[in-house]
């Protein structure tokens, strides 16, 4: 919350795609470093950096607000919350089992998730809006218009 206003201004200035790209690249490095660190001071510094990058995740919400139809906001947000909640239960449970075998591997898997998120962020257009939800050549409306 300490940097929320500045992060919001940064997202407004550089856009959601660039903000999420910065976040995920940073998280890749942080998670790999977590997997390699062996002293508490470095881990504490990484923890602070980790939370600073996670604060940029607000860009996902601003992206959603730009592309979503206002009448679909509540239902879509509900589905998104449910999916996130399921992931927040299943992934830590599975990684808890991995932790018993290798603590470093847990963080390398986290870096892998950040790589996947980075790739997904590249699908966000630089100026998102209704009808411009993705950089892919065929959006939802074009696919429906093209027919089977």
Model regions and ranges:
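Loop-to-transmembrane helix entry/capping segments in MFS-fold secondary transporters
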Residues: 70-80
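Transmembrane alpha-helical cores of Major Facilitator Superfamily
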Residues: 25, 48, 78-86
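Intracellular juxtamembrane helix-capping segments at the cytosolic ends
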Residues: 55-68
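Structural signature of the two symmetry-related core transmembrane helices
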Residues: 18-33, 111-112
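Intrinsic disorder in cytosolic terminal tails and internal cytosolic loops
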Residues: 124-148
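Hydrophobic core of transmembrane alpha-helices in multi-pass small-molecule transporters
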Residues: 41-55
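Transmembrane alpha-helix termini and helix-breaking/packing motifs in multi-pass membrane transporters
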Residues: 90-106
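Helix-to-loop junctions at the C-terminal end of transmembrane segments
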Residues: 3-16, 99
């Amino acid at each position: 919350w300490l940097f929320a206003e500045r992060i919001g201004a940064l997202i407004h200035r550089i856009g959601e795609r660039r903000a999420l790209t910065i976040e995920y690249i940073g998280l890749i490095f942080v998670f790999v470093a977590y997997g390699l660190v062996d002293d508490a001071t470095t881990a504490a510094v990484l923890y602070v950096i980790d939370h600073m990058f996670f604060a940029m995740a607000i860009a996902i919400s601003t992206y959603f607000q730009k592309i979503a139809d206002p009448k679909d906001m509540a239902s879509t947000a509900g589905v998104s919350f449910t999916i996130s909640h399921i992931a927040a239960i299943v992934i830590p449970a599975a990684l808890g089992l991995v932790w018993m075998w290798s603590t470093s591997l847990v963080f390398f898997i986290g870096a892998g998730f950040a790589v996947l998120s980075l790739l997904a962020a590249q699908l966000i257009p630089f100026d998102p809006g209704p009808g411009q939800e993705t950089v892919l050549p065929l959006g939802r409306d074009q696919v429906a218009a093209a027919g089977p």
